[in-house]
């Protein structure tokens, strides 16, 4: 069967693949994000990136920094800056809990995944993370390679 030409392909999730390699994820939390209509359309088309982005708490609000959203090509209004700060929507108690945990040395908020829930609302999965040391990263690579070799051996036999 042939695919319809006029309908665009929608992406269900955008992930930050480097985050789990470079950080040890201690806890995860789901947050909403405040976007404009043209930005939502771009994210639905998969024109967004979470690499090198992070979240910070400023004046009791959580902000997502450096999330790249390419401007929507059919937007007739003025274009927005692709890497502007975007507000994340959390309950005040959750923000206070995150603030107390972030005040510990070495912890940060990293976006792990952006996805649309069942109602079609864009959500960001944040991870409370601690940076890995170089030897931890090497160990991760070693474990990944060992798993890959086991999978290849299983396929052969």
Swiss-Prot record:
Entry-linked Gene3D superfamilies: 2.40.280.10
Designated gene of the protein: smpB
GO BP terms in the entry: trans-translation
GO CC, any one term: cytosol
Localization terms from the record: Cytoplasm
Family: Belongs to the SmpB family.
Matches recorded under PROSITE patterns: SSRP
Single Gene Ontology MF annotation: RNA binding
Cited CDD domains: SmpB
Pfam entry (one): SmpB
Name of the molecule in the record: SsrA-binding protein
Function (record text): Required for rescue of stalled ribosomes mediated by trans-translation. Binds to transfer-messenger RNA (tmRNA), required for stable association of tmRNA with ribosomes. tmRNA and SmpB together mimic tRNA shape, replacing the anticodon stem-loop with SmpB. tmRNA is encoded by the ssrA gene; the 2 termini fold to resemble tRNA(Ala) and it encodes a 'tag peptide', a short internal open reading frame. During trans-translation Ala-aminoacylated tmRNA acts like a tRNA, entering the A-site of stalled ribosomes, displacing the stalled mRNA.
Sorted UniProt keywords: Cytoplasm, RNA-binding
Principal location listed in the UniProt entry: cytoplasm
């Amino acid at each position: 069967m042939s695919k319809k030409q006029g309908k665009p392909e929608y992406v269900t999730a955008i992930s930050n693949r480097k985050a789990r390699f470079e950080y040890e994820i201690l806890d995860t939390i789901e947050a909403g994000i405040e976007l404009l209509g043209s930005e939502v359309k771009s994210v639905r088309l998969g024109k967004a990136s979470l690499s090198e982005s992070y979240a910070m708490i400023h004046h009791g609000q959580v902000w997502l920094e450096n999330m790249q959203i390419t401007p929507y090509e059919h937007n007739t209004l003025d274009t927005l800056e692709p890497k502007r700060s975007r507000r994340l929507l959390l309950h005040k108690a959750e923000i206070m809990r995150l603030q107390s945990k972030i005040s510990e040395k070495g912890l940060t908020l990293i976006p792990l995944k952006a996805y649309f829930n069942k109602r079609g609302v864009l959500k960001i999965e944040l991870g409370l993370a601690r940076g890995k040391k170089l030897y931890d990263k090497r160990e991760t690579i070693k474990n990944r390679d060992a798993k890959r070799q086991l999978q290849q051996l299983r396929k052969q036999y």
